[in-house]
Each structure stands twice: as C-alpha cells, then as structure tokens.
C-alpha cells in the first residue's frame, strides 16, 4: 500500500478539535464490540497504515502515541472503513489484552442505568 | 429519569470542536453494527434523554437536529454507555430504515481496499 496515496484518496475532512486538525477514530474488535474512540492527525493515520498497528493523537499530551506502547496492549489493524462525510474512520483490530487503561476490555464499560453511572460486566466490558 | 440530574452524574468532558463544547456520540444497532458517529452538545443530549430519540448537534448548520426529522429514519434509544474519559457516549438504538443520508444502512459503507475507497455491501452497509 502506498500510504501517501491512500491517505490522499481517503479525502478526509479534518476537524478543528482542541485547536488541531484531527479526525475521529472508532476502534472495534472482530466481533463488532466498540473498544474505544480517539483522535488521529494525519501523521497518526500514516503511522497506523505503515506499521499495521494503531496509532492515535493525544490532545492532552499533544503528541502521537502508539496504542499499547507502555501496556503492551497493542491493536493490530485488520481492515478499515470511512464514513460518508470523511471525518471518521472505523478500524477493525485484533486487540491484545484489554483496550482500556482502566483494565476493562472496552473503554465503554460505564453503563447508565436509572440515571446512574455503573461499571458493568455486560456487553462492553468483555469479549 | 431526571435528565438534568443524569447529565450531571455523567460527568462529561466536553471537547472544543469547531469552536463548540461537544462530545462524541457513536450510535450502534442492537447487533453491534456501528451506524454513525456525530457530535452532541448538552442540549442534544438532554433532548435525546427526554424524548427517547436521538438528537445530535450539526457543526455545519450550527444547530440541534433530531435524527430522521426529514427522512423519517429515526433512532429510538435503547441504552447507552460512557467511555472512561467522558468525552464520548455509545448509544444502542433501534434504527428505522437506514442511518446514512446516502441511502446505506451505516455511514461507514466505504471500505478501503488495496488503497482504494470502495462502496461495499459487506459488513457495514447492511443489517
């Protein structure tokens, strides 16, 4: 894959997010569980396509990060999709270990029940 | 559900997106297909919880919109989750008709194959 060429053909609509030019990256496993959502700048996208492993852009640390660089919980890219208006990509990955830094399989492990935030084992906190 | 109280308990981290205070809203069907991702301001979230139907915030039109208000393709809220850092919600909905204004079931119907953008019937363009 010619990464420069692919990124051009994606015709992405970068958004002004926290003062940076970013797109949304939704990451799912092969069973369609949503693992996380994060941001990507063009460099993070290129690194992802070049290496085959997910890279994101951290708005708080203002830098590129390779998912799992400290925890070892890397995400191997399998395939990806673009949405209709081009400001979001959906990545299907093979998740090593867990996606969430809080130790849960998915970052979406807080369920809202009866108006309360509850950590739940249901649906998004397990494979 | 006391909507004001629930929104407070969600303890959301609104992001500066296109100059507005917004969160990310990922919407999936009951089979875990990702239908779309859009933005919500606090008003859109409250309207969603009050009415039981998805409302988003359009950054281009700079206004609240009720999903399906013109097409009739409304999204009935079933349940929802918050992510670990509080800048995103994941909504599980019952989708009437199709989610995408281009006529596809999901907005993520462009697959990237061999570096090319292809409209695909696979995975995200059908139930």
UniProtKB/Swiss-Prot annotation, chains A, B:
GO cellular component: cytoplasm
Zinc in keyword set: yes
Free-text cofactor note: Binds 1 Mg(2+) ion per subunit. Binds 1 zinc ion per subunit.
Intracellular or extracellular location(s): Cytoplasm
Entry annotated with the keyword Cytoplasm: yes
Pathway: Amino-acid biosynthesis; L-histidine biosynthesis; L-histidine from 5-phospho-alpha-D-ribose 1-diphosphate: step 3/9
Top class in the EC scheme: hydrolase
Chain positions recorded as Zn(2+) binding sites: 84, 100, 107
Cofactor(s) recorded in Swiss-Prot or TrEMBL: Mg(2+); Zn(2+)
Keywords assigned by UniProt, alphabetized: Amino-acid biosynthesis, Cytoplasm, Histidine biosynthesis, Hydrolase, Magnesium, Metal-binding, Zinc
Record EC number: 3.5.4.19
Gene3D superfamilies linked: Phosphoribosyl-AMP cyclohydrolase (3.10.20.810)
GO molecular function per UniProt: magnesium ion binding; phosphoribosyl-AMP cyclohydrolase activity; zinc ion binding
Subunit-level organization: Homodimer.
UniProt name for this protein: Phosphoribosyl-AMP cyclohydrolase
Gene: hisI
């Amino acid at each position: 894959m010619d990464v420069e060429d692919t990124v051009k053909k994606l015709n992405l609509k970068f958004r002004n997010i926290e003062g940076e030019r970013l797109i949304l990256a939704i990451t799912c496993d092969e069973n369609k569980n949503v693992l996380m959502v994060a941001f990507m700048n063009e460099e993070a996208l290129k690194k992802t396509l070049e290496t085959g492993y997910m890279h994101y852009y951290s708005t708080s640390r203002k830098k590129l990060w390779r998912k799992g660089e400290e925890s070892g919980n890397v995400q191997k890219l399998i395939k990806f999709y673009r949405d209709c208006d081009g400001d979001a990509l959906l990545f299907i990955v093979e998740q090593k270990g867990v996606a969430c830094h809080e130790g849960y399989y998915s970052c979406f492990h807080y369920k809202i029940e009866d108006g309360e935030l509850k950590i739940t084992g249901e649906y998004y906190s397990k494979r």
